[in-house]
């Protein structure tokens, strides 16, 4: 069952690329994607190394201790969608959307903890996941805003 879930998220992620890649400015979305992937993978490496949580079933377990599908694909794609929908929003809209985007992913993770062997919490909880997602969404949103501001001629 766990591998079917991973395949489902992989296929949905691949399909969703065709939706976000067509919107302009495409270079911004590519930067957002790779920045979020870097942040998620980097932070998750520490979280796993300090045994706050673990991923017993994951792609390429002999190479990666982190859940690369979510860290390097699902979360970055979700962050691109977040940046696209909050593109013209004010601060309140940006913050509210960051919270709203983090809630479904947190709920999915919580379901995964309770019903699968994809993720096991040791010294971690759903609130920490939600907070991590909101903070990284806002960080990436802020960084891309700075890039836009200082890259204009």
What is the predicted function of each stretch?
Residues 1-153:
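Aromatic-rich, lipid-facing transmembrane alpha helices and their immediate juxtamembrane interface loops
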């Amino acid at each position: 069952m766990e591998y079917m879930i991973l395949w489902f998220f992989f296929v949905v992620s691949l399909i969703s690329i065709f939706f976000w890649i067509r919107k302009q400015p495409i270079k911004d979305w590519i930067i957002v994607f790779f920045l979020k992937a870097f942040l998620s993978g980097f932070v998750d490496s520490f979280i796993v190394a300090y045994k706050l949580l673990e991923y017993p079933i994951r792609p390429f377990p002999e190479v990666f201790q982190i859940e690369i599908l979510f860290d390097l694909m699902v979360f970055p794609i979700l962050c691109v969608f977040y940046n696209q929908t909050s593109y013209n929003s004010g601060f309140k809209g940006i913050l509210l959307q960051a919270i709203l985007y983090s809630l479904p992913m947190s709920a999915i993770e919580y379901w995964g903890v309770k019903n699968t062997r994809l993720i096991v919490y040791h010294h971690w909880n759903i609130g920490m996941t939600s907070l991590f997602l909101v903070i990284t969404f806002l960080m990436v949103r802020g960084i891309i805003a700075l890039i836009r501001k200082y890259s204009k001629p």
